[in-house]
A protein has these predicted regions:
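Positively charged, proline/Ser/Thr-rich regional signature most characteristic
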Residues: 38-104, 108-110
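Residue-level detector of anion-binding/catalytic polar loops
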Residues: 59, 127, 144
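Flexible, polar/low-complexity N-terminal or interdomain linker segments that lie immediately upstream
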Residues: 1-71, 151
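Short Asp/Glu-rich motifs
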Residues: 72, 140-141
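Active-site neighborhoods of enzymes that stabilize oxyanions during catalysis
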Residues: 142-151
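Catalytic cysteine-centered active loop of the rhodanese-like fold, especially the PTP/DSP P-loop
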Residues: 93-139
Protein backbone atom coordinates (compact mmCIF):
# COMPACT_ATOMS: atom_id res chain seq x y z
CA UNK A 1 0.00 0.00 0.00
CA UNK A 2 1.34 3.40 -0.86
CA UNK A 3 2.04 5.95 1.86
CA UNK A 4 -0.56 8.39 0.54
CA UNK A 5 -3.32 5.79 0.86
CA UNK A 6 -2.33 5.14 4.45
CA UNK A 7 -2.28 8.89 5.11
CA UNK A 8 -5.69 9.31 3.44
CA UNK A 9 -7.28 6.48 5.45
CA UNK A 10 -5.74 7.80 8.65
CA UNK A 11 -6.95 11.34 7.90
CA UNK A 12 -10.47 10.14 7.18
CA UNK A 13 -10.50 8.13 10.41
CA UNK A 14 -9.29 11.06 12.48
CA UNK A 15 -11.80 13.39 10.81
CA UNK A 16 -14.71 11.02 11.44
CA UNK A 17 -13.62 10.49 15.04
CA UNK A 18 -13.34 14.21 15.76
CA UNK A 19 -16.65 14.85 14.00
CA UNK A 20 -18.41 12.17 16.04
CA UNK A 21 -16.84 13.54 19.21
CA UNK A 22 -17.96 17.08 18.43
CA UNK A 23 -21.55 16.34 17.46
CA UNK A 24 -22.55 13.28 19.49
CA UNK A 25 -23.08 15.18 22.74
CA UNK A 26 -21.47 12.31 24.65
CA UNK A 27 -17.96 12.62 23.24
CA UNK A 28 -14.75 13.09 25.15
CA UNK A 29 -14.09 16.59 26.43
CA UNK A 30 -11.18 17.85 24.37
CA UNK A 31 -11.14 21.07 26.36
CA UNK A 32 -12.85 20.67 29.72
CA UNK A 33 -13.10 24.44 30.10
CA UNK A 34 -14.84 25.20 26.82
CA UNK A 35 -17.62 27.80 27.02
CA UNK A 36 -16.56 29.24 30.35
CA UNK A 37 -15.76 32.89 30.85
CA UNK A 38 -12.17 33.84 29.98
CA UNK A 39 -9.88 33.17 32.92
CA UNK A 40 -12.31 30.66 34.47
CA UNK A 41 -11.95 26.93 34.80
CA UNK A 42 -14.24 24.17 35.97
CA UNK A 43 -14.15 24.24 39.75
CA UNK A 44 -14.68 21.11 41.82
CA UNK A 45 -15.56 21.16 45.52
CA UNK A 46 -15.86 18.47 48.20
CA UNK A 47 -19.01 16.94 49.62
CA UNK A 48 -18.43 18.83 52.89
CA UNK A 49 -18.16 22.14 51.01
CA UNK A 50 -21.31 21.27 49.05
CA UNK A 51 -23.19 20.60 52.30
CA UNK A 52 -21.98 23.92 53.76
CA UNK A 53 -23.06 25.81 50.64
CA UNK A 54 -26.43 24.05 50.59
CA UNK A 55 -27.02 25.07 54.21
CA UNK A 56 -26.25 28.68 53.21
CA UNK A 57 -28.78 28.64 50.38
CA UNK A 58 -26.88 27.26 47.38
CA UNK A 59 -28.88 25.60 44.63
CA UNK A 60 -27.77 21.99 44.03
CA UNK A 61 -28.49 20.31 40.70
CA UNK A 62 -28.45 16.57 39.95
CA UNK A 63 -27.18 15.91 36.41
CA UNK A 64 -28.03 12.20 36.54
CA UNK A 65 -31.10 10.83 34.79
CA UNK A 66 -34.49 11.40 36.44
CA UNK A 67 -34.81 7.71 37.39
CA UNK A 68 -31.61 7.92 39.45
CA UNK A 69 -32.77 11.20 40.99
CA UNK A 70 -36.04 9.56 42.10
CA UNK A 71 -34.16 6.65 43.71
CA UNK A 72 -32.06 8.96 45.89
CA UNK A 73 -30.65 12.47 45.72
CA UNK A 74 -29.23 15.25 47.86
CA UNK A 75 -32.11 16.77 49.87
CA UNK A 76 -33.03 20.12 48.38
CA UNK A 77 -31.42 19.37 45.01
CA UNK A 78 -33.24 19.71 41.69
CA UNK A 79 -33.07 17.34 38.76
CA UNK A 80 -31.32 18.80 35.70
CA UNK A 81 -30.46 15.68 33.67
CA UNK A 82 -27.82 16.11 31.01
CA UNK A 83 -29.87 14.15 28.46
CA UNK A 84 -32.93 16.37 28.99
CA UNK A 85 -31.06 19.61 29.63
CA UNK A 86 -33.09 22.06 27.51
CA UNK A 87 -36.49 21.06 28.92
CA UNK A 88 -35.28 20.91 32.51
CA UNK A 89 -33.35 24.18 32.15
CA UNK A 90 -36.47 25.96 30.88
CA UNK A 91 -38.40 24.81 33.96
CA UNK A 92 -35.61 25.81 36.36
CA UNK A 93 -34.37 28.96 34.61
CA UNK A 94 -36.05 31.54 36.91
CA UNK A 95 -34.62 29.79 39.97
CA UNK A 96 -31.19 29.44 38.33
CA UNK A 97 -31.02 33.10 37.31
CA UNK A 98 -31.86 34.16 40.86
CA UNK A 99 -29.15 32.08 42.53
CA UNK A 100 -25.49 33.08 42.77
CA UNK A 101 -24.19 29.80 44.22
CA UNK A 102 -24.92 26.65 42.20
CA UNK A 103 -23.40 23.17 42.63
CA UNK A 104 -23.86 20.36 40.09
CA UNK A 105 -23.27 16.66 40.72
CA UNK A 106 -23.61 13.39 38.83
CA UNK A 107 -22.87 9.69 39.35
CA UNK A 108 -19.17 10.38 40.09
CA UNK A 109 -16.05 8.30 39.36
CA UNK A 110 -15.65 9.12 35.68
CA UNK A 111 -19.12 10.56 35.09
CA UNK A 112 -18.90 13.63 32.84
CA UNK A 113 -22.57 14.66 33.11
CA UNK A 114 -21.91 17.31 35.77
CA UNK A 115 -19.06 18.77 33.71
CA UNK A 116 -21.24 18.84 30.60
CA UNK A 117 -24.15 20.45 32.46
CA UNK A 118 -21.84 23.12 33.92
CA UNK A 119 -20.60 23.91 30.39
CA UNK A 120 -24.17 24.10 29.06
CA UNK A 121 -25.16 26.37 31.95
CA UNK A 122 -22.17 28.62 31.21
CA UNK A 123 -23.33 28.91 27.59
CA UNK A 124 -26.57 30.34 28.99
CA UNK A 125 -24.78 32.72 31.37
CA UNK A 126 -25.28 30.64 34.52
CA UNK A 127 -22.12 29.66 36.39
CA UNK A 128 -21.77 26.66 38.70
CA UNK A 129 -19.22 24.48 40.46
CA UNK A 130 -19.03 20.68 40.54
CA UNK A 131 -19.29 18.29 43.47
CA UNK A 132 -16.05 16.33 43.04
CA UNK A 133 -16.77 12.60 42.63
CA UNK A 134 -20.49 13.39 42.72
CA UNK A 135 -23.15 11.27 44.35
CA UNK A 136 -20.72 8.62 45.73
CA UNK A 137 -18.76 11.34 47.56
CA UNK A 138 -21.99 12.58 49.17
CA UNK A 139 -22.92 9.04 50.23
CA UNK A 140 -19.40 8.24 51.47
CA UNK A 141 -19.54 11.35 53.67
CA UNK A 142 -22.68 9.92 55.30
CA UNK A 143 -24.84 12.94 54.51
CA UNK A 144 -28.64 12.76 54.27
CA UNK A 145 -30.36 11.35 51.18
CA UNK A 146 -33.88 11.79 49.88
CA UNK A 147 -36.08 9.63 47.64
CA UNK A 148 -38.76 10.74 45.21
CA UNK A 149 -39.14 13.33 42.49
CA UNK A 150 -39.31 16.41 44.73
CA UNK A 151 -36.32 18.34 46.10
Amino acid sequence: MRWWRVAAILSIGVGLGLGWNAFSGRGFALDKNAFLRPGEALVEISAAETKTRLEKGALVLDARGLDFYKLAHIPGSYSLPEEDFERAFAALEPRLRGTADIVVYCAGYGCEASHNVVRKLAQKGVYAVILNEGWPAWQDAGFAEKEGDLP
